[in-house]
Amino acid sequence: APKNIVLFGATGMTGQVTLGQALE
């Protein structure tokens, strides 16, 4: 989910993967 990765980019790499995949 590229959109989520961009939205949570400020959270950090770990946050991108965790939150991005969770909301995918």
Curated annotation (Swiss-Prot):
<dbReference type="GO" id="GO:0052874">
    <property type="term" value="F:FMN reductase (NADH) activity"/>
</dbReference>
<dbReference type="GO" id="GO:0030219">
    <property type="term" value="P:megakaryocyte differentiation"/>
</dbReference>
<dbReference type="GO" id="GO:0004074">
    <property type="term" value="F:biliverdin reductase [NAD(P)+] activity"/>
</dbReference>
<dbReference type="GO" id="GO:0005737">
    <property type="term" value="C:cytoplasm"/>
</dbReference>
<comment type="similarity">
    <text>Belongs to the BLVRB family.</text>
</comment>
<comment type="subunit">
    <text>Monomer.</text>
</comment>
<feature type="binding site">
    <location>
        <position position="12"/>
    </location>
    <ligand>
        <name>NADP(+)</name>
    </ligand>
</feature>
<feature type="binding site">
    <location>
        <position position="9"/>
    </location>
    <ligand>
        <name>NADP(+)</name>
    </ligand>
</feature>
<keyword id="KW-0808">Transferase</keyword>
<feature type="binding site">
    <location>
        <position position="11"/>
    </location>
    <ligand>
        <name>NADP(+)</name>
    </ligand>
</feature>
<feature type="binding site">
    <location>
        <position position="14"/>
    </location>
    <ligand>
        <name>NADP(+)</name>
    </ligand>
</feature>
<comment type="function">
    <text>Enzyme that can both act as a NAD(P)H-dependent reductase and a S-nitroso-CoA-dependent nitrosyltransferase. Promotes fetal heme degradation during development. Also expressed in adult tissues, where it acts as a regulator of hematopoiesis, intermediary metabolism (glutaminolysis, glycolysis, TCA cycle and pentose phosphate pathway) and insulin signaling. Has a broad specificity oxidoreductase activity by catalyzing the NAD(P)H-dependent reduction of a variety of flavins, such as riboflavin, FAD or FMN, biliverdins, methemoglobin and PQQ (pyrroloquinoline quinone).</text>
</comment>
<keyword id="KW-0560">Oxidoreductase</keyword>
<dbReference type="GO" id="GO:0042167">
    <property type="term" value="P:heme catabolic process"/>
</dbReference>
<dbReference type="GO" id="GO:0046627">
    <property type="term" value="P:negative regulation of insulin receptor signaling pathway"/>
</dbReference>
<dbReference type="GO" id="GO:0052873">
    <property type="term" value="F:FMN reductase (NADPH) activity"/>
</dbReference>
<keyword id="KW-0521">NADP</keyword>
<protein>
    <recommendedName>
        <fullName>Flavin reductase (NADPH)</fullName>
        <ecNumber>1.5.1.30</ecNumber>
        <ecNumber>1.3.1.-</ecNumber>
        <ecNumber>2.6.99.-</ecNumber>
    </recommendedName>
</protein>
<dbReference type="GO" id="GO:0035605">
    <property type="term" value="F:peptidyl-cysteine S-nitrosylase activity"/>
</dbReference>
<keyword id="KW-0963">Cytoplasm</keyword>
<dbReference type="GO" id="GO:0042602">
    <property type="term" value="F:riboflavin reductase (NADPH) activity"/>
</dbReference>
